[in-house]
Swiss-Prot record:
Taxonomic lineage of the native organism: Eukaryota, Fungi, Fungi incertae sedis, Microsporidia, Unikaryonidae
Family: Belongs to the RANBP1 family.
Keyword Membrane (UniProt): no
Pfam families named among the record's database cross-references: Ran_BP1
GO cellular component, one term: nuclear pore
Protein task: Important for the export of protein containing nuclear export signal (NES) out of the nucleus.
Protein known as: Ran-specific GTPase-activating protein 1
PROSITE patterns in UniProt: RANBD1
RanBD1 domain mapped to chain residues: 70-210
Length: 219
């Protein structure tokens, strides 16, 4: 019975999120995303994004122009462990229990990633607001990225106490490295946590937009 309820809940999430992902991808394809773009059929060089969350390589170029995944699972786990140690001084703006979903490029559907604790924090080194989700028990991250000013968080119409948003630089899972843009859905267990997340996300988004403009003007 629990399995049936889980599948029904996931089906609701998928039906309400595909349209949002398509709109976001359309925006990226028009060239307004943070990251790589193309012009005249040739790739153009861009500066490294300020939203990179770790040093895990995205892909290696193989012979004949083919790309191969260059991902070491043990390295990913070690980098996430170091993240927990190195960011203990960050200011916690929001913290609550949740269930996190992500859009899988393999199944073309939303998949449950984990239950755990969602945190919005002010990163002390960059002075940028970021989102981090810690999974229960296994001590790994469910997501880890700075809030991109381009992407608003929107209530998920078919999931109670649910928000959805996108990121261009989350790389905590190997699946995330296969696609530039990531769609996340989070479900909170209380209306209060749902409201507070939306408020803190908006504040963090506005803060990051201002901070990034200031950094750009100083160059």
């Amino acid at each position: 019975m629990a399995e049936v309820e889980r599948k029904e809940e996931q089906a609701k999430i998928e039906s309400g999120s595909n349209e949002q992902k398509e709109r976001g991808l359309d925006g990226v394809n028009k060239g307004d995303a943070v990251g790589d773009g193309k012009e005249g059929g040739e790739a153009k060089k861009v500066q490294q994004s300020p939203f990179l969350t770790n040093a895990v390589p995205r892909k290696d170029e193989g012979k004949g122009g083919e790309e191969r995944d260059n991902i070491d699972a043990a390295e990913v786990v070690e980098k996430q462990r170091k993240h927990l140690e190195e960011n203990q001084s960050d200011e916690i703006l929001f913290k609550a229990r949740c269930k996190l979903y992500y859009f899988s490029e393999e199944t073309k559907a939303l998949e449950e990633r984990a239950e755990g604790t969602m945190i919005i924090e002010m990163h002390s080194k960059s002075n940028l607001a970021k989102i981090t989700m810690f999974r229960d028990q296994i001590g790994r991250l469910g997501c880890n990225h700075f809030i991109n000013p381009r992407f608003k968080a929107q209530p998920h119409g078919k999931v109670s106490n649910g928000w959805m948003w996108m990121s261009t630089e989350d790389t905590v899972e190997t699946d995330a490295l296969r696609k530039k843009i990531q769609l996340f859905v989070v479900k909170f267990y209380s209306e209060e946590d749902f409201k507070r997340f939306g408020e803190e996300y908006d504040l963090g988004r506005a803060h990051n937009e201002k901070a990034l403009k200031t950094k750009t003007n100083k160059k």
